[in-house]
């Protein structure tokens, strides 16, 4: 074998993202993805005197909580030490936590929980995270609880024990990533709107006692930069925010006026996910995460519902649960079988033992004892549910006007002044907003972003409570398809025909931007045929990669299963002709002709394809990310940009690749590994590249058994391309 490695500074960003590691990340992709490989995290704050004075001010402040104005940011240098080398990154740090248990004196030296934002590099793909004093999260309970939730399918952050040193003071801390884009992708979700409970009114707001204004606290957006990316993301965020605000308003009205402990249901009781999440937290003694100000939310455009993001449950896994009143006598806890499964327990133990520094024997003891108590708590919860009479008369959903009136009454009682926006309407590139008092103004997208993320406008506290949530789904159809066991959501102009006998699904566009989303379907032995309209026959208005419903594909398949499936697509004006998300199985054939942009885009999936053919694509012919992909035969022609693009920690193997005409043949990026037995590429400027492009990943690898190509090979310092003898 011969190695062709060319350092080519074609992108300053790509070559410097991990320039401060004394090893090539591609050589240790599996190791740097394992928490146990991290031996120590060292943080040095150059302005140590100011940093220590900040600690002293927090310690001696007269408030019970940590004053927000003392959570100042400090520049820092962060070093991650492994057995095989170390990385040094620029970072910013600040005090973390609400209460003063996040600061302690250890042998006279200051130890504090801190928020860290890396300006370069990453730790286990995270660029924003917390280093927490273990006692603030009940130590091992937080690590194990986060793992169990993630294994059950909930969104939960990467969490592990790690040895640290901050300005020379050593301690064991809990590493926990923040709720961000990287967290979503780790949990197989595409970037989208993120929200949390609004805390501004809780902590020393205008000298009100802590928590005295909790009945006025609703929610806020935590990723306004995503909102500002374009009109589609603005549309999605505002629609979701209106729905969440109404749910939070309902909660405050019921909880604080009627005295009933109700969960927050942002999906309007149409889904059991928040009920199941609450029950799971109860049996794990993690109900602290259900406090409104600890709640975090993700809006999933594919399921068209909110999902909870775990945060700060204060788990006590080995204690009997304090169980609330059951939801109803018909409720069945959904995770009973899995929590009793020995295979599930073994998977959890393996993950746990690599994330703690107490040794395997103590780890096994802790896991076994925790599961024994959780199982008993589940039993008690189910027995309590079985014995309850269905609730009647206790809870009646109040109307939005009633909830709003009572909210305004409480606002007057507390003498809290807030501007209240009641409607938002897009006018060209700005927004026409109306207040409850009827006053109208024009706000820019940046001003709207500040309202929904900070509840502020021009220095004044301002909240958005939509009196009428606009029905923005009037141009969609939803259909349950019994033959494949799932649902289809699609544009009204699109034609959908299902032939159960021939196992064919035929889809035809009226407008070239029409689209369809299949959710949770089983396509065993089925053929999907998508007949698209010509690109010039389109009323397409969106300017981002996705439309106002978050779809990038003409044909979208979400959480679906394949076996001997065939997919044929022709034309259409979507960013992806075919988009497969979070799906599994084997596909016999995919054929795409005249793709407007990407031909085939697959994300967060584990899929094998026997034959894939793309003939003409306005961008990439094949683009995969965040998954495991195996293909026998790939035939690509006339790819405007890349023939094959593999990114975001993917593994792709292929037997044969035939490509004619592309700017770049194969691109392996961002901790991905490509292995192609035989490739023949003609009409390309660059045969292959292996690079790191995103901060949250490392280098990439591409291995060719044989590569017949006359173009360039591009490799950055963290990556490698290996070619067989020709």
Annotated model-derived regions:
Residues 180-281:
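ATP-dependent phospho-/nucleotidyl transfer catalytic cores
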Residues 116, 266-313:
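Active-site acidic catalytic loop and adjacent metal/ATP-binding pocket
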Residues 238, 285-286, 298-420, 427:
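C-terminal catalytic region of ATP-dependent kinase domains
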Residues 456-726:
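Extracellular beta-rich repeat passengers
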Residues 19-90, 304-305, 368-502, 509-510:
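Regulatory N- and C-terminal appendages and interdomain linkers associated
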Residues 81-218, 283-286, 302:
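Conserved ATP-binding subdomain of kinase catalytic cores across diverse folds
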Residues 4-15:
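Bacterial N-terminal signal peptides
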Residues 54-56, 102-105, 185-189, 291-296, ...:
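Short, solvent-exposed loop/turn and secondary-structure capping segments
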């Amino acid at each position: 074998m011969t190695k062709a490695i060319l350092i080519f500074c074609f992108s300053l960003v790509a070559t410097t993202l991990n320039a401060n590691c004394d090893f090539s990340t591609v050589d240790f992709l599996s190791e740097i993805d394992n928490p146990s490989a991290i031996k120590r995290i060292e943080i040095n704050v150059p302005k140590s005197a100011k940093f220590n004075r900040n600690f002293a001010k927090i310690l001696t402040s007269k408030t019970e909580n940590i004053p927000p104005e003392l959570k100042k940011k400090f520049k820092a240098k962060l070093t991650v030490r492994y057995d095989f080398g170390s990385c040094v990154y620029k970072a910013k740090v600040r005090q973390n936590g609400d209460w003063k248990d996040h600061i302690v004196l250890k042998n006279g030296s200051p130890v504090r929980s801190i928020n860290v934002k890396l300006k370069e590099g990453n730790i286990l793909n995270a660029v924003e995270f917390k280093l927490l004093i273990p006692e603030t999260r009940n130590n091992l309970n937080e690590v194990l609880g986060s793992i169990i939730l993630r294994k059950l399918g909930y969104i939960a952050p990467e969490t592990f024990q790690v040895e640290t040193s901050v300005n020379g003071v050593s301690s064991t801390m809990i590493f926990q990533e923040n709720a961000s884009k990287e967290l979503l992708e780790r949990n197989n979700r595409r970037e989208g709107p993120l929200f949390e409970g609004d805390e501004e009114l809780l902590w020393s707001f205008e000298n009100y006692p802590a928590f005295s204004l909790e009945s006025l606290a609703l929610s806020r957006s935590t990723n306004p930069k995503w909102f500002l990316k374009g009109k589609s993301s603005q549309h999605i965020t505002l629609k979701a925010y209106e729905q969440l605000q109404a749910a939070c308003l309902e909660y405050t009205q019921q909880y604080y006026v009627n005295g009933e402990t109700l969960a927050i249901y942002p999906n309007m009781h149409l889904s059991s996910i928040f009920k199941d999440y609450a029950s799971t937290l109860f049996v794990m003694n993690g109900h602290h995460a259900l406090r409104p100000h600890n709640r975090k939310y993700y809006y999933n455009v594919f399921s068209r519902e909110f999902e909870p993001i775990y945060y700060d449950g204060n788990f006590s896994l080995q204690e009997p649960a304090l169980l609330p009143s059951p939801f109803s006598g018909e409720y069945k806890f959904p995770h009973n079988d899995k929590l009793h499964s020995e295979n599930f327990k073994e998977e959890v133990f393996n993950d746990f033992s690599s994330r703690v520094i107490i040794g395997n024997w103590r780890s096994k003891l802790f896991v076994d004892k925790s599961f024994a108590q959780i199982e008993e708590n589940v039993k008690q919860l189910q027995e309590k549910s079985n014995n309850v009479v269905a609730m009647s008369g206790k809870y009646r959903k109040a109307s939005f006007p009633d909830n709003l009136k009572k909210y305004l009454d409480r606002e007057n009682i507390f003498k809290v002044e807030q501007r209240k926006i009641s409607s938002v309407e897009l006018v060209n590139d700005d927004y026409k907003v109306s207040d409850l008092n009827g006053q109208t103004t024009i706000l820019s997208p940046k001003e709207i972003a500040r309202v929904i993320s900070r509840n502020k406008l021009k220095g004044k506290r301002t909240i958005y409570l939509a009196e009428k949530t606009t029905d923005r789904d009037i141009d969609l159809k939803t259909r349950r398809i019994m033959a494949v066991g799932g649902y289809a959501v699609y544009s009204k102009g699109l034609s959908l025909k299902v032939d159960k006998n021939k196992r064919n699904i035929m889809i035809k566009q009226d407008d070239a931007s029409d689209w369809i989303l299949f959710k949770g379907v089983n396509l065993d032995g089925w053929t999907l045929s998508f007949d698209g309209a010509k690109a010039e026959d389109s009323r397409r208005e969106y300017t981002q990669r996705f439309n106002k419903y978050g779809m990038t594909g003409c044909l979208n398949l979400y959480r679906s299963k394949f076996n001997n499936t065939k997919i044929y697509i022709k034309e259409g004006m979507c960013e992806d002709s075919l988009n497969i998300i979070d799906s599994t199985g084997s596909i016999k054939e995919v054929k795409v002709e005249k793709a407007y942009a990407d031909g085939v885009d697959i994300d967060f999936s584990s899929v094998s394809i026997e034959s894939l053919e793309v003939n003409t694509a306005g961008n990439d012919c094949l683009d995969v990310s965040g998954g495991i992909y195996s293909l026998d035969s790939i035939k690509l022609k006339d790819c405007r940009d890349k023939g094959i693009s593999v990114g975001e920690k993917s593994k792709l193997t292929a037997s044969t690749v035939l490509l004619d005409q592309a700017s770049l043949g194969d691109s392996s990026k961002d901790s991905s590994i490509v292995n192609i037995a035989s490739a023949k590429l003609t009409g390309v400027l660059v045969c292959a590249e292996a690079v790191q492009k995103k901060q949250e990943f490392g280098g990439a690898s591409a291995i060719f058994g044989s590569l017949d190509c006359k173009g360039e090979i591009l490799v950055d310092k963290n990556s490698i391309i290996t070619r067989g003898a020709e």
